[in-house]
Amino acid sequence: MVVSSDQGDSLDVHPINKKPIGERLGYWALNRTYGYENVLPSGPLFRSAEFRDGAVYVSFDYGDGLRSVDGAPLCAFEVAEEEGFYELATAIVEDNCLKVYNTNIKNPRFIRYGWQPFTRANLVNKMGLSASTFRVAASAACVIIDKVSQMQGFPQENENFAKGVSACYAGIAAGKLLIAGGCNFPKIPVHAGGSKKYYRDIYTAELSKDSVLVWQRAGQLPQAMAYGVSVSTADGIICVGGMNEQAALSTTYRIRVANEKAVVETLPSLPCTLDNMTGALLENKLYVAGGNKDGKASNAFYCLDLEQLSQGWQELPAFPGVPRVQPVSAAQLDADGQLCFYLWSGFAAPTEERDASLSVDGYVYSPAANTWTPLPEVMDEVGETVSLSGGVATAWDKNLIICMGGVDKDIFLRALQKTAADYLTHPVEWYRFNKRVLVYDVRLREWQTIACIPDVARAGAALVVCGENIFCINGELKPGVRTPEITCITIKK
């Protein structure tokens, strides 16, 4: 492509000075037709745009050395929340791409550059070749974060629990936010040989429009437990598997709330112990996948029909590839409108038969076809793979899956390989837990980073969705160190 927009005139869009246009045609021909790879063929050509954190991050082909041609601030960029309502925007170079923003526009969804018959647009590359004009809209499937709030209040009657837990069970029951179980190292840190403590108390809190949660102890689980799966249903919260100080568990419980008290019902047990797995509800069927099956990392996949409990848990075809402990999952419609089970990430410690593994790819299970199909690797805004192992995920709208949290793939894999003897002793920042909020579009089969929120950089958090609010509950900031924080992400409808 040869750019001529910078050679126009306010009264005549056709260039009077033809020489620069001819030279640019020559550069293009030398590179593309005659193979002179050392000749830059064009000015910056739009490649992609990431709409996140109140700005648009634009990358270009032939974009090395981005600058203004005249040394003045970059101009002719505009952004808008709604098509047709554009405002001029500031553009600055960051890491060889452009950050474009207007402080009056909180969530830009459209961007354009030099979008007039005559423009004084001044973006060039290192060769001084002008950038092409462009206009781009954010994907219609994009999620817009309205606000991020830190909820105030966490159960205080047990001073050990009050320090925050990891891997608790959580959900919505009778309109209340409920948490149960979980574990932490309340006295001595794990790196100093501290013992992990498991809990069995059940707490509930009313949800209101403010950020204050007033917790009440509503009862107890039949035993202390953590590291299982919990899902909210119209008839209570289902808690599956997990483990405690004594053993891994095969139990399944349903927690209902009536008259401010938790009522726990025992449902059919799994045919094996299962902990550190993932799970999701597809209509009336609860699926769980991966985790440690009878103490070993697995590819296990089971289903319980909540309307036919007498049939118990049914074993389904295992997902392909390596075993996955602490993967993430969500139930969402596929491109054909069929409800499916989506699975990503997970890890497995080394054994005599296989090396340590940390997965960044995924699979989708179709109940209709009873088969697994590969999914794209989790990708961030610059095309790097991301681990969601230990993170959380939830379906959103009709074709999106929101994911957050999880360990850093490189650091954690080295820990699994036992190449870092001092792994447990570093400060929180060293572990680089994932702070991105990522969205997967099942129709486009694409990932998008919509925000970077340090408060969701956790592993072992619980995720609860209520209306437009997503609650990220507790979890660990680094191995062995829990947080009592509950972060609420409000999605703009």
Where would I find each of the regions flagged by the language model?
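Mature catalytic domains of secreted/periplasmic carbohydrate-active enzymes
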Residues: 6, 20-23, 39-43, 93
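Surface beta-strand/loop "capping" patches
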Residues: 31-73
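Kelch-like beta-propeller repeat domains
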Residues: 142-493
